[in-house]
Amino acid sequence: SEITRPMAPGHFNAIFLSDCDALELPMIGTSDIHQPIQTDIDFARGQHRTMTFVFVRERSAEGIREALLHRRTAVYMDEKVIAEEQWLKELFEKSIDIEDIKRNEKSIVITLKNNSDLTFHLKKTRHNPGLVYFREYTIQPQCRHRIEIRLENNIQGGDINFEITNLYAAPNKGLTYSYKV
């Protein structure tokens, strides 16, 4: 069985994610296609086969072996990345640069730059109600994105909190991420 075998819409085969954790196995994504690949995947629209990201320390066969033995892998399918939390957090932080922060008494505007070829879907989570910002954001690959935060009730700053809904470290739960403003 495969970790990414189709399940109910928006889900992946979570039992195998738990098995990887319990058995201390690296996560490996594959695709099992028996007909020409173009019948299932539309490359012209940016679709891709399921694949494995291997986070190596050196670009060599030994570097790949060492990363697999230490479970530094992620599965990439559709727009989802499935991995241990530490690798997802590092992937996100290395992908997104904060290019600019503009602040005045009533608002903060953060300009982000996504330097990767991945799309990130952010959903606002529990936060200080004096920080007012949109509920959901999509940060496209190789693009800039602005997050505008209104400051209400004499709030000077705090944490903006998100779930990155397409980065999975646990079944059906995206990576939680906070940024101090």
Regions found by a protein language model. Give the residues of each.
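Domain-core and long-helix interface of multi-subunit machines
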Residues: 1-43
